[in-house]
Amino acid sequence: MKMTTTLMATSAIVMAGTSAFADAHMASEMTIVSWGGAYSASQQAAYHDPYSEMTGVTIINDESSAEAVAKLRAMSEAGNVTWDVVDVVASDAIRLCDEGLALEIDADTQLADGDDGSTASEDFGDLLVSDCFIPQIVYSTTAGYRTDLVGDTPPTSICAMFDLETYPGMRSLEKRPINNMEWALLCDGVAKADVYDVLETEEGQAQAFAKLDTIKDNVVWWSAGADTPQLLADGEVVMGTTYNGRLFALIEEQKQPVGMLWDAQVFDLDGWIIPTGLSPEREARALDYVKFATDTQRLADQAKYISYGPARASSAPLVGQHATLGIDMAQHMPTDPENAKNTFLYNYEWWADYRDDLDAKFQAWLSQ
C-alpha cells in the first residue's frame, strides 16, 4: 500500500463562513483514499493542502481506490474501518450505498451551497446519482496513440483499436469489463442506444467477448492509470486506453509524441463517499472535509492541475488556465463541445447491478 503523509500545519485557522474547522470533537488525522498519479496530485494541491493549512489536520494518502469495494467489505466484516474518505467512481458508490457501507448524505444540509446562490442539490443536479455519493469531477476513459507509429492516417474512431491490419502492434486496455465490453459491441455493429440491452443477455456478452478475442493476443492489460501513459511513452504499444487526464499530462506536460482520440470517450463520474462504521469524531471530520473539498471554488481549483471537469455547475465559469503551463483548460475538458461530439454515456446503475457477475466472467475469459 503506497502512502504519503501531508505536512501538518502548526496552527489551525478558522475561516469565516466555514464550519468549525478546529472543533475539538473532530479527529486530528484522516486517511483519504484515491487513485494516485496526476489525479491525486491535483487533489493534494486543490483540497488536501489548503484543508490541512486551515485545520492542522494530518492527511494520509492511500492509493487504493481501484480496490475500494472489496477492501471496504473486508473492513466492515472485520469491524475495523481504517479509511475516512474514499474517492470512487459512481457505480461503486451505488454498490457501497446499497450494501450499507457508505454514509448517506443530505446534500442541502451537509454540503456547501453554490457560489451562485444555488443549493448543493441544484448545483450538482443529475450528478447526484446516489444518496451516498458526493460528486467531484466528470472525466472520461478514452484512447491515446503514438503519432509516430500510426503512419499517415491517424485513427479517428475507437474501432481502430480492433483494426490490426491498418494499425498493427500492441494495444493496452484496462483489465476489467467496463468500457471494453461496450466498445466491443459498438465496433461490432450494435447501435449506441442498444448496447446495454444487448449486454444484458448471454448472447450479447458472448458477442462482446468474441470481438475482444480478435485482439486479445495483441493486448497489454493494465490495472493502474499510469500504465498506458508509460507504455505509450516507451513505444511498447501503438495505442491504448486510459483516463483523459493521464493523456493530457503525457501530451501537454511531458510533450510525448501522442495524440488523443476523443471518439466514443466514456463519460464517468468520480467523487467521495464516507464509509459507515467511523467513530463520531472521525465521521465529523470526514463530513467537514468533503464540505470544504466540494465547494464551488475548490472544484474549480482542481481544474488548474488536471483536465477533468468540475461536477458543480457553478464551478465551470471559474475554470481558467493551468497552474504551471498557462494554457486554457476548458478546451482540454472531456465536456468541451468539440471533444464531446461522439460520447458514450456510462450506465452507473446497470454496472452496479451487473459488475460482480461480469467481473467474474471477464477474469475467466482472460485466463482462457
Task: Locate each region found by the language model.
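A bilobed periplasmic-binding-protein/Venus flytrap-type ligand-binding module shared by bacterial periplasmic
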Residues: 142-149, 185-186, 269-282, 301-304
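Mature extracytoplasmic/periplasmic domains
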Residues: 275-342
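Early extracytoplasmic/lumenal segment of secretory-pathway proteins
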Residues: 24-95
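Gram-negative bacterial Sec-dependent N-terminal signal peptides
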Residues: 1-22
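Conserved C-terminal helix/tail region of periplasmic/extracytoplasmic solute-binding proteins
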Residues: 335-368
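Extracytoplasmic ligand-binding site segments that recognize negatively charged/polar headgroups
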Residues: 37-44, 82-83, 87-227
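Periplasmic-binding protein-like
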Residues: 205-214, 253-276
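A ligand-binding cleft/hinge motif common to bilobed small-molecule-binding domains
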Residues: 93-95, 239-257
